[in-house]
């Protein structure tokens, strides 16, 4: 294989990794959809949990939130220390296991989800602290909104 073709292969891989970061993520992408595991980890690590109710294959705002915020390395770095993310997908065109579909529908009913996307912010013990939707401006704006919500909940708790 020539040096030129190796360079082309490397450049193609780099482009794919940038365009589709979850595909090239070293972590198991399915982990962030496991609600019981996410709740247990939030308690264990004493971090808030973001429950993201998403319809990424039919809701433009859900798709934007997922691509502009959740799929960005900067969000992963911030959330690694400050909070956890659990994505709950409501696909219309993709198949999901019946267990995941049931879990997500039950959670949408429990939290009275009426629009997508909705991000329910939970305390480490499971209490609801607030809600967010899509916020234009990428990771910085979204993380600032989450941090503001968390600061308000801390200042109002006894």
Please provide the spans of the model-predicted regions.
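Loop/turn elements at helix/coil->beta-strand transitions in domains of secreted/extracellular proteins
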Residues: 45-50, 81-86, 114-117, 124-127
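Active-site-proximal beta-strand/loop segments in catalytic clefts of secreted hydrolases
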Residues: 53-56, 88-91, 122-124, 134-135
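Local sequence-structure signature of Cys/Sec-based thiol-disulfide redox active-site neighborhoods
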Residues: 37-71, 75
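Bacterial N-terminal signal peptides
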Residues: 11-22
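Non-catalytic, surface beta->alpha helical segment in thiol-disulfide oxidoreductase systems
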Residues: 68-69, 106, 110, 114-155
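Bacterial N-terminal signal peptides that target proteins for export
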Residues: 2-12
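N-terminal "domain-start" segment that seeds a small globular fold
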Residues: 24-40
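Thiol-based oxidoreductase modules, predominantly thioredoxin-like and allied folds used
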Residues: 31-32, 72-102
């Amino acid at each position: 294989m020539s040096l030129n073709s190796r360079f082309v292969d490397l450049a193609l891989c780099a482009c794919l990794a940038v365009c589709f970061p979850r595909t090239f993520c070293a972590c198991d992408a399915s982990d962030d959809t496991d609600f019981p595991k996410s709740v247990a980890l939030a308690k264990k690590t004493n971090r808030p949990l973001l429950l993201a109710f998403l319809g990424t294959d039919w809701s433009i705002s859900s798709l934007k939130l997922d691509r502009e915020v959740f799929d960005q390395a900067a969000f992963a770095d911030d959330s690694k220390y400050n909070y956890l993310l659990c994505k709950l997908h409501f696909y219309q065109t993709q198949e999901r296991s019946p267990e995941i579909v049931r879990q997500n529908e039950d959670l949408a009913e429990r939290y009275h989800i009426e629009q997508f996307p909705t991000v329910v912010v939970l305390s480490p013990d499971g209490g609801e602290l607030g809600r967010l939707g899509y916020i234009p401006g990428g990771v910085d704006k979204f993380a600032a909104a989450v941090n503001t919500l968390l600061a308000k909940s801390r200042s109002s708790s006894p």
